[in-house]
C-alpha cells in the first residue's frame, strides 16, 4: 500500500521493486542524454586554442610573402593586412569559404561569447525547470534534444557575427534542460536504497565535461567540424526519446494517474514482473487529492522558515562552488594546460574510488565536507608556497588535486540537491541552482580575465570559499536512505517527524495500489 503525500512510501518502488532492468535502462538513457553537455565548447570558449585546417584566402592579392590564420604580408613582409575571408576544411575533406572568424576578432569577443552562452544557460535552466514541473520531464528533455540538433546544424554554417552570437544565446536557452533533467528523472524512478548509486552513474557526463570539454573541443580541427559531429550525435538521441519515460512520481502528483499506471505497467514487463490486467492506483476518497491541490507558488517557499533557509542555503552553495571551481580550472588550464588536466583526470579517478569506498560507512554530506576540506587545505598550501616563494614541483600537483576534489564535490551536490525539493518545484529549484552556479562562473571569469585581484589574493579567496562551503554543509540535511519529499511540507527536514503519515492530512487508506 502506498500513500500520496507522505515522505516514506513510493508507488514505483512498491510495484517494480528496488532495482531492475527498467531502472537501469532509464539511468543509462538519462546519462546518454546528458552527453551533449560535454560538447558545449562555447561555455569556456575563451580557453580554446585557435582552430586548425583554416587558411586565409589570399587569392585576390599578389606577391604574398607570408600568411597566418588572421593576417598575411606582401612585398617581403613590409605590409601586413588582415584576412577578410577564409577557407575552412570541413570534416577533414570539404573546403568552404567564410567571411568572418571569431578567433581573428578582438580577444574580448571570445570572453563575451562565453558570457552570452552562460547567460543563456542562466535563463534556460530556470525556464526548463518551470516547463518540467508544469508539463512533465519528458517534454523538457524532448525540446532540448530537438533544439540541440537544430541550433548545432545552423551554427556549423553560420557566417555572421551578429547571427552567431544570437544563435549561441538561443542554443544555450533552448538546450539547457538535459544538463540536469536526467538527474531528476533518475531520482524519481530510483528507490531509496539505489538512488545514490544511480545518481552517481547519471552524473558521470557532467563530471567528465568539467575536465574534458576544452581538450575535446581542441581535438577537432575547427568548430565547424566539431559542431557537425555534435549535431550527428544529437540526431542519434532522437531514437532514445522513444524509450524515455515520463516520471511516474510526477504524473501521480499532477493528476496523471492513468498515465502513471501505463508507465508502471510497461516498466513491470521490462522488469519481468507480472501484474494483474486490472492494475489500478485507486483513490479511496477525494481527500487523497488534497495534496495535489497544494499551492506551489514561490510565496509558499518563502513563507515557511525552514524551507526558506534550506532553499537559500543551497542557492548560495551553488554560487560559491561554481566560483571556486572556475577559478581552480582556469589556473590549472593556464599554468599546466593538458598535463594539468591529465593529472586532474587521474586524481579524479583516484578520489572517486576513495569516496566510493568511504560511502559504505559515511554519509554523502560527510564526504562532501571532506572533499571541501581537501580543497581548502590545497588552496592554503598554495598561499604559503606563493608567499614564501618556494619553487618546488609539488605546486604542479596541488592545483590539479584541488580541481579533482572540486569535481567530486560537483558529483556529490548533484546527488544531494534534487533530493531536497518537493516534486512540483524540484526541477524549477534545481534549475535555479544551476543558474546561480553559472552566475558564479561568470563573476569568476570577469575577475580572472581582467585581473582585478592579485593571484595570491585569489587563492586566499578560494581557501575562504572552501571554509564557507563547509559551514553551509552543516545546514544541509542528510539525504541517505530517505524518500524524496513529495510535497512542500516534506521539505521541512528540520522539524521532528511526529506525524509522518498525516503531514498532509492523508491517511494510509486513502490511496492504494491494487
Go through the PLM ranges and name each one:
Residues 136, 157-162, 220-221, 385-389:
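Helix-breaking motifs and short loop linkers at transmembrane-helix boundaries and internal kinks
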Residues 50-80, 221-288, 463-502:
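Central mid-sequence intracellular linker of multi-pass
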Residues 123-154:
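Conserved MFS/SLC helix-loop-helix module at the cytosolic interface between two early adjacent transmembrane helices
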Residues 112-130, 182, 342-357:
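Central cavity-lining transmembrane alpha-helices of secondary-active solute carriers
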Residues 38, 172, 330-333, 337-501:
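C-terminal transmembrane bundle
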Residues 2-24, 70-108, 269-338, 497-514:
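Flexible cytoplasmic loops linking transmembrane helices in multi-pass membrane transporters
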Residues 51, 131, 216, 358, ...:
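Hydrophobic alpha-helical transmembrane and interfacial-helix anchor sites in secondary transporters
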Residues 33, 37, 120-121, 175-180, ...:
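Glycine-rich segments within core transmembrane alpha-helices of 12-TM secondary carriers
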Amino acid at each position: 500500500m502506498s500513500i500520496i503525500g507522505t515522505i516514506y512510501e513510493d508507488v514505483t518502488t512498491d510495484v517494480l521493486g528496488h532495482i531492475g532492468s527498467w531502472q537501469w535502462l532509464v539511468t543509462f538513457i538519462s546519462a546518454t542524454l546528458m552527453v551533449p553537455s560535454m560538447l558545449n565548447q562555447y561555455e569556456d570558449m575563451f580557453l580554446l586554442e585557435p582552430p586548425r585546417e583554416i587558411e586565409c584566402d589570399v587569392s585576390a592579392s599578389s606577391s604574398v610573402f607570408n600568411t597566418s590564420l588572421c593576417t598575411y604580408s606582401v612585398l617581403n613582409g613590409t605590409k601586413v593586412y588582415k584576412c577578410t575571408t577564409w577557407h575552412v576544411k570541413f570534416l577533414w575533406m570539404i573546403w568552404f569559404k567564410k567571411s568572418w572568424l571569431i578567433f581573428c576578432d578582438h580577444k574580448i569577443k571570445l570572453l563575451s561569447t562565453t558570457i552570452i552562452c552562460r547567460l543563456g544557460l542562466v535563463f534556460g535552466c530556470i525556464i526548463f525547470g518551470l516547463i518540467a514541473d508544469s508539463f512533465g520531464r519528458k517534454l523538457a528533455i524532448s525540446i532540448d534534444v530537438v533544439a540541440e540538433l537544430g541550433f548545432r546544424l545552423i551554427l556549423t554554417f553560420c557566417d555572421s557575427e551578429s547571427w552567431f552570437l544570437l544563435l549561441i544565446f538561443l542554443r544555450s536557452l533552448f538546450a539547457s534542460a538535459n544538463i540536469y533533467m536526467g538527474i531528476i528523472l533518475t531520482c524519481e524512478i530510483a528507490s531509496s536504497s539505489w538512488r545514490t548509486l544511480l545518481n552517481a552513474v547519471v552524473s558521470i557526463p557532467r563530471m567528465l565535461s568539467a575536465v574534458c570539454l576544452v581538450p575535446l573541443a581542441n581535438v577537432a580541427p575547427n568548430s565547424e567540424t566539431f559542431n557537425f559531429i555534435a549535431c550527428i550525435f544529437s540526431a542519434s538521441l532522437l531514437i532514445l526519446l522513444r524509450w524515455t519515460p515520463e516520471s511516474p512520481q510526477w504524473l501521480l502528483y499532477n493528476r496523471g494517474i492513468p498515465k502513471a499506471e501505463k508507465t508502471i505497467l510497461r516498466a513491470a514487463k521490462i522488469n519481468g514482473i507480472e501484474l494483474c490486467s486490472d492494475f489500478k492506483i485507486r483513490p479511496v476518497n477525494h481527500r487523497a487529492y488534497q495534496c495535489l491541490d497544494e499551492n506551489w507558488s514561490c510565496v509558499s517557499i518563502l513563507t515557511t522558515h525552514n524551507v526558506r533557509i534550506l532553499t537559500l542555503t543551497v542557492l548560495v552553495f551553488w554560487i560559491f562552488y561554481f566560483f571556486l571551481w572556475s577559478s581552480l580550472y582556469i589556473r590549472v588550464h593556464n599554468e599546466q594546460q593538458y598535463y594539468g588536466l591529465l593529472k586532474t583526470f587521474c586524481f579524479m579517478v583516484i578520489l572517486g574510488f576513495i569516496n566510493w569506498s568511504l560511502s559504505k560507512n559515511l554519509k554523502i554530506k560527510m564526504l562532501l565536507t571532506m572533499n571541501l576540506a581537501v580543497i581548502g587545505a590545497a588552496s592554503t598550501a598554495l598561499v604559503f608556497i606563493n608567499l614564501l616563494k618556494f619553487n618546488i614541483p609539488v605546486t604542479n600537483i596541488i592545483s590539479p588535486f584541488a580541481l579533482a576534489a572540486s569535481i567530486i564535490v560537483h558529483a556529490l551536490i548533484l546527488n544531494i540537491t534534487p533530493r531536497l525539493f518537493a516534486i512540483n518545484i524540484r526541477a524549477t529549484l534545481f534549475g535555479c541552482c544551476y543558474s546561480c552556479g553559472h552566475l558564479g562562473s561568470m563573476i569568476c571569469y570577469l575577475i580572472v580575465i581582467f585581473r582585478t585581484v592579485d593571484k595570491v589574493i585569489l587563492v586566499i579567496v578560494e581557501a575562504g570559499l572552501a571554509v564557507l562551503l563547509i559551514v553551509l554543509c552543516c545546514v544541509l540535511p542528510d539525504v541517505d536512505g530517505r524518500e524524496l519529499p513529495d510535497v512542500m511540507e516534506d521539505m521541512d527536514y528540520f522539524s521532528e517527524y511526529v506525524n509522518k503519515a498525516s503531514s498532509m492530512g492523508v491517511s494510509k487508506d486513502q490511496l492504494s495500489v491494487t
